[in-house]
Amino acid sequence: MTSTSDAPQDPWHDIRPYQDDEVAATLTRLAEDPELLSALTRYRLPRLSRMTPRLSRTLASWAIKRETRDVTSVTAFQQRIAAYMQRMLKTSTDDFRVDGLDRLDPGTAYLFIGNHRDISLDPAFVNYALYLAGRNTVRIAIGDNLLKKPYVTDLMRLNKSFIVPRSARGKRAMLQAYHKLSSYIRHSIQDDNHSIWMAQREGRAKDGIDRTDPAIIKMMTMAHRADNRHAPLGEGIEALRLVPVSISYEYDPCDVQKARELKAVSEDGSYNKSEFEDISSIVAGITGHKGRVHLRFGTPIDRSFDTPEAVAAEIDRQ
């Protein structure tokens, strides 16, 4: 069992996923969160939520407590999610195929870097593939721009997500935040032997062009370079056991919304999201028809790539 440490011994306490001894308090908090309860009733009980909002929230709270009454660990929570994934696959996909996972050592932690088409499902499909293969699930990198509500933060961190800083102000603050993130990634891979999933770029590829941002590669190796200033970049990459992962969906449930955003950026130069647009995209991605889904795991990138651009190109090639 994992346990919570005080901040000095736990330097990543504010960005890391929740641990087993934090599960019970988090679930209690979620079952009493009025914003979460209102959001659930709007989607599952729309008429009742309009007519008797207090009753609908009470029912939602009771449902959360009933569904999670035996959940006392992160693993148990994810086992519940696996059941929902199975149901989602049956109702919204025609086929789910996985290639390449059998070539990776089940006892080794990897830093999976993947293309990004869906806010929640890209890492969810990676996790489900690992779950079906009897392997440990990944810790998921998620931008703090998605964590605008406390209940969203709780749900994500309960599902083994860690926080990527995007809202830090000022160059110095951003560098400190990214160094902290880089050190956590290294700690997870090398000390905890726990795999990670991270997107190849900031935000989804709304235009369908999957291209790795070299800045992501620089961030990943910051901690290694801080300890070994003259070490080649390839050494840090090899130590992280970086493995490209690609996912493709036959149909994208969010294609209209993505096209609308691209059109606005093209014509107006910017796009302003509505308050709950990301949440709506998550729901649409989960419930919408996806057709055939194909997930492919690549091979670990070795130390022969000596620049962030070269590493990014190899990720894109695979």
Model feature map: region roles:
Residues 1-110, 116-127, 131, 153, ...:
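Membrane-anchoring hydrophobic helices of lipid-metabolizing enzymes
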Residues 81-306:
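Soluble catalytic domains of membrane acyltransferases
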Residues 308-318:
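Long, compositionally biased intrinsically disordered regions
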